[in-house]
């Protein structure tokens, strides 16, 4: 539809889905809009972005649709955070405030990242099964074994951080799927014995590291929501040193600076998370765009 078309252009920048792959446009558009709001939650700033996008609708239709939806997401999370043009004490937050509940914001960001990675893993499994790669679907790091390992890692982290325990049960949960992945890697390699051992070791280590690093990458979702408040606080701090006129000029210019500069940075960071933490797991982007046959008569 016309709403998804602008997001399709952003997906195409990474690549075109082939015949067997899930078209990620719907997932991309929903998660991109959601993440932008989480990272740039402010009622006033969101209204400015949405209004500005509407004013540009005639000249930049695709851009205006994306901008308007991002603005609405920012407004929505602005109510969640209780933030209005950087002021955190005008309205009550509906749920959490990055200023007063930074730990909760960090945990929510990690939870969102885990959900995002699980969905990406499920799509990778679906793509493997579609083309008949059952071994990869069940036993690879991006298959069911990889998903079970990730779930086991989440469980182990929860047990360690919340219940302060990490015992035999957690070790078994981690090693069981990992053993299937290592066995699959061993069978896939055609190198000599020593090289095969080295390949399996390196690939397993890479899987473990990427499991942790990919999840922690989503901490930037929380980091930018905290950064948003810090920038606003800096603006208000400078404004407080001036007379009435200087105060409001500084506040207005500071908010414009935040909307333009931080808004652009957040949009790019969201794109990075989509491409490198999402698409790289299930989307090859090696398809070819459909071009209808044209006959010259």
Language model features: what each stretch is:
Residues 1-297:
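Conserved, carboxylate-rich catalytic/transport cores that coordinate ions
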């Amino acid at each position: 539809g016309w709403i998804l078309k602008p997001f399709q252009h952003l997906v195409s920048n990474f690549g075109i889905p082939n015949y067997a792959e899930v078209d990620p446009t719907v997932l991309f558009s929903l998660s991109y809009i959601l993440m932008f709001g989480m990272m740039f939650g402010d009622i006033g700033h969101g209204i400015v972005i949405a209004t500005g996008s509407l004013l540009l609708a005639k000249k930049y239709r695709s851009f205006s649709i994306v901008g308007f939806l991002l603005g609405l997401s920012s407004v929505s999370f602005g109510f969640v955070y209780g933030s209005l043009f950087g002021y955190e004490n005008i309205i009550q937050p509906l749920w959490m405030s990055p200023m007063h509940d930074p730990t909760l914001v960090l945990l929510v960001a990690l939870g969102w990242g885990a959900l995002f990675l699980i969905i990406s893993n499920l799509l990778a499994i679906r793509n493997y099964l579609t083309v008949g790669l059952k071994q990869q679907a069940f036993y690879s790091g991006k298959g069911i074994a990889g998903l079970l390992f990730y779930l086991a890692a989440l469980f182990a982290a929860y047990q360690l951080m919340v219940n302060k325990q990490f015992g035999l049960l957690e070790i078994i949960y981690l090693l069981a799927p990992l053993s299937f992945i290592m066995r699959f890697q061993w069978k896939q390699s055609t190198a000599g014995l020593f090289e095969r051992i080295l390949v399996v070791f390196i690939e397993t280590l890479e899987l473990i590291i990427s499991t942790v690093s990919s999840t922690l990458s989503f901490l930037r979702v929380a980091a930018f929501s905290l950064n948003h408040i810090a920038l606003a606080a800096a603006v208000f701090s400078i404004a407080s040193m001036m007379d009435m006129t200087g105060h409001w000029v500084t506040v207005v210019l500071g908010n414009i600076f935040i909307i333009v500069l931080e808004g652009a940075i957040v949009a790019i960071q969201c794109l990075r998370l989509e491409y490198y933490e999402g698409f790289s797991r299930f989307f090859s982007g090696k398809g070819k765009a459909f071009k209808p046959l044209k006959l010259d008569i």
